[in-house]
């Protein structure tokens, strides 16, 4: 994107990219069909269905779950190391080593992609109430847009801190007035969106709609947001609802949820959908050296009997010079055309969040916190914790965060977990990397700073 990234995101996202699903019945059929004018588009239920599909499509972007989040969240953490200063012109290496300049194009393009997605959802929510169609379907479309917008802003605020909070479709003139809102304002908007989504979304889908956001996914994401804000008591009811619903469960083996032949399984609450062939695959671990460079300390953190250890081992790719982590291995893939879905919310994540929240509200030597934590451990073939081993709130907190690292490795959680628990600087120090305190959030892309040219309302993050 050029220097008008955010401005362009709010004026061209619908006509240039949003309607990638026109005339398609299956929301995974993401081939472009038409690019109608936005002013004339939102007239029927089918129009809104296509627009919602376009919002899902945005998440697939190479600048989000299709690639760059891997750099921004995993390579930034103590899970993955980029050892090649020349990798992608140094873009990933600089992020891995906390020396990225404000002109880093990974940051610029991810920012632009996230705000393009925000505008897609804004346009849906702006226009949907003015069109008459089935109330249940309308509520679902609103819920899907609210869920996706909440997820987009959750990623924005965790990556950059204060960000522009834009909740309506805008013009270039409007965009020039945007300011960077406080983190608390952004989180309040996320909570509002996800709370509404818990009501508007159905619990399950059938047929071609399986894989869309559900009320359970909205509850889990809302709980994750609340825990990030340290609102542990508020998160517990949402997590308890998911656990008690009976809709989700741990699969028998830790690797089962990731199999390309096992999509939409009972452990997945929400995943970004990919499908090998044409425009619908991804190249997450291909064409990079990151797949080759799992941090040795991550592998060392697993006990030998842990069934999750092989998932972070590198696997040679047929007919390709690269290797990929087994967790995301697709034996039928080719470079940049991988069919694995990318998990955003898994039931194992829910159980660990539930254990964490319960412990933060009050440590107990028995009960649901230990039960939830140990369910994840025993599925992995490692011994359950006892109250003798984990005897205090502090010890339990450490145990949960360590378990999250082992269970959710390479799933775009580790850096966020380190930052929210205040342990990022110490964790990276163990890998030989010194993290300046200001680099717990990324610099605002320089292109945004330049185009706004307003140090009062649109300042750079401190220290950059």
Task: Enumerate the language-model features and the residues they cover.
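Conserved, well-structured interaction surfaces
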Residues: 37, 49-53, 57-63, 85-160, ...
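Long, intrinsically disordered, low-complexity segments
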Residues: 22-23, 56, 64, 77-88, ...
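Acidic, glycine-rich segments characteristic of secretory precursors and extracytoplasmic regions
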Residues: 2, 23-74, 123, 184, ...
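Short, surface-exposed recognition loops and adjoining beta-strand edges that mediate ligand/DNA contacts
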Residues: 39, 66-88, 166-168, 201-284, ...
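Sec-dependent bacterial lipoprotein signal peptides
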Residues: 1-21
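TPR-repeat structural position
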Residues: 232, 364-366
């Amino acid at each position: 994107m050029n220097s008008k990234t955010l401005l362009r995101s709010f004026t061209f996202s619908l006509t240039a990219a949003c309607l990638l699903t026109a005339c398609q019945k299956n929301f995974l059929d993401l081939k472009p069909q038409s690019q109608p004018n936005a002013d004339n588009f939102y007239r029927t239920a089918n129009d809104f269905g296509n627009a919602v599909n376009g919002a899902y499509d945005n998440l697939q972007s190479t600048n989000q779950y299709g690639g760059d989040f891997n750099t921004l969240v995993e390579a930034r953490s103590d899970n993955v190391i980029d050892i090649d200063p020349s990798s992608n012109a140094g873009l990933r290496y600089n992020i891995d080593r906390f020396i990225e300049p404000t002109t880093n194009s990974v940051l610029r393009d991810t920012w632009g992609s996230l705000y393009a997605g925000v505008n897609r959802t804004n346009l849906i929510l702006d226009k949907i109430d003015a069109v008459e169609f089935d109330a249940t379907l309308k509520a679902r479309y609103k819920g899907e847009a609210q869920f996706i917008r909440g997820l987009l802003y959750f990623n924005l605020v965790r990556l950059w801190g204060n960000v522009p909070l834009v909740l309506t479709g805008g013009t270039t003139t409007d965009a020039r007035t945007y300011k960077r809102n406080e983190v608390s304002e952004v989180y309040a908007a996320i909570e509002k969106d996800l709370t509404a989504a818990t009501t508007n979304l159905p619990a399950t889908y059938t047929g071609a709609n399986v894989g869309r956001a559900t009320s359970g996914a909205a509850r889990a994401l809302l709980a994750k947001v609340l825990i990030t804000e340290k609102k542990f008591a508020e998160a517990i009811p949402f997590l308890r609802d998911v656990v008690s619903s009976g809709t989700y469960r741990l699969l028998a083996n830790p690797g089962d949820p990731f199999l390309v032949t096992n999509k939409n399984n009972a452990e997945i609450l929400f995943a970004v959908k990919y499908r090998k062939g044409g425009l619908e695959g991804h190249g997450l671990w291909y064409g990079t050296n990151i797949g080759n460079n799992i941090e040795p300390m991550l592998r060392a953190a697993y006990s030998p009997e842990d069934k999750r250890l092989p998932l972070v081992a590198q696997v040679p790719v047929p007919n390709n010079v690269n290797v990929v982590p087994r967790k995301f291995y697709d034996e039928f893939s080719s470079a940049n055309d991988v069919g694995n879905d990318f998990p955003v919310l898994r039931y194992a994540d829910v159980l660990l969040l539930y254990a964490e929240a319960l412990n933060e509200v009050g440590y107990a030597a028995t009960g649901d916190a230990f039960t939830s934590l140990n369910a994840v451990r025993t599925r992995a073939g490692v011994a359950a914790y006892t109250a003798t081993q984990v005897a205090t709130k502090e010890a339990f907190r450490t145990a949960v965060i360590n378990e999250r690292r082992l269970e959710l490795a390479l799933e775009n959680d580790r850096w966020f977990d380190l930052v929210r628990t205040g342990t990022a600087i110490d964790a990276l120090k163990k890998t030989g990397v010194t993290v300046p305190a200001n680099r717990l959030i990324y610099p605002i892309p320089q292109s945004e700073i330049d185009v706004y040219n307003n140090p009062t309302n649109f300042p750079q993050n401190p220290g950059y």
